[in-house]
Design a protein with these regions (language model features):
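Non-heme di-metal
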Residues: 1-178
């Protein structure tokens, strides 16, 4: 009996952490696009991607509330950090903003893929699995769109994207528990 209770609590903790980090990530992504759009105001491509991120954030906000999961305490940092990252990359050049999108979305692709692996046999989380699958497909679409818009044509592409990937991975790690 006690073992079943511990196992159930552990499974809930795992999905709670997933939802918390996904909500934080979608919030950060929205703030990156807000920063980019502050500079590239009429960019239809960025606006379209930003609109999808708003829907992603709304979905995870809803799940967070429904399940009574606390959001990350790091939201104020992701608020400012995401906005500054987006604004700074857009101020340098539109292609740099697109390279930022590629870097973030490559990490998110792997992050969501890992979550899919953990959830694929969990019959109680089919709805969450489908949502993550849908959002992963859209994040891959964002990456591909950014690549189509010459993201790789900037000097220092590898160095810049590796830096952004490292920051994104750190944000994911911290947001799971804090």
């Amino acid at each position: 009996m006690a073992k079943n209770l511990i196992t159930k609590k552990l499974k809930n903790t795992i999905t709670d952490d997933m939802i918390r980090v996904n909500q934080a990530g979608e919030f950060g992504a929205q703030r990156i696009y807000d920063g980019q759009l502050a500079v590239l105001k009429n960019d239809k491509t960025i606006k379209k991607m930003a609109q999808q991120e708003v829907k992603h954030l709304e979905a995870f906000n809803k799940i967070l509330l429904e399940r009574g999961i606390r959001p990350t305490a790091l939201s104020p940092f992701w608020n400012l950090g995401g906005y500054l990252l987006g604004m700074t990359t857009a101020m340098i050049d539109r292609k740099v903003a697109m390279a930022c999108t590629v870097a973030v979305e490559e990490v998110i692709d792997e992050h969501y893929k890992s979550q899919q692996e953990k959830l694929k046999n969990n019959t109680k989380e089919k709805k969450l699995f489908k949502l993550i699958t849908k959002f992963r497909d859209e994040e891959i679409e964002h990456k591909n769109t950014a690549l189509e818009h010459n993201a790789k044509d900037i000097k220092g592409y590898k160095v810049m994207t590796q830096g952004i990937k490292s920051i994104t991975k750190l944000a994911i790690f911290l947001s799971k528990k804090i």
